[in-house]
């Protein structure tokens, strides 16, 4: 059955604030797979208190949620983030009414072919979605280690995540500001540098990016001349710095 959401769309376009349910585990919008339609959906509210009450209802499910305010000027980037996360459906709560709205009805889906002229992964929704589902389940508090059904579910989520990782490309940043003449990717030479992050303990972390959006959040030396390379997951190892550590929050 087709639902006419035109009135709701007009309200969306005029709203100054929406409230969104986020996962405390991933710090991203909380995503659920609808058991009947298999839509990957998020929850939005017009009222902050309603969003908070919804979050409280998930406490008994051992699913810690929080309510995040999204301002009108933030909405385009927020909706792009939902596409990056693999979301296709919004459950919109307005007062005592609840509507299911396809994300494409709220914000147009980006033209991936047009955006991907450089063959860089503009979005990696398959990876992000399966990682989100895996982490949301893996880090649930108050779980029994001898729960065989849950462990089987975790193995299935992990397997799906790994399949998507193996199929994906990741963005590697290369600093060529010290290279003399033309840069040759096949013969990079000693003047090519790999950007890294060092914390207060002198630990080194090498940034890899799942998509362009994640790269844009990274702010290296503004004087650095960076070249982006799309590397298949199975070919990443030769590019990784030996002294780099794994992110302890993963």
Where are these regions (language model features)?
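An interfacial alpha-helical scaffold signature
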Residues: 1-250
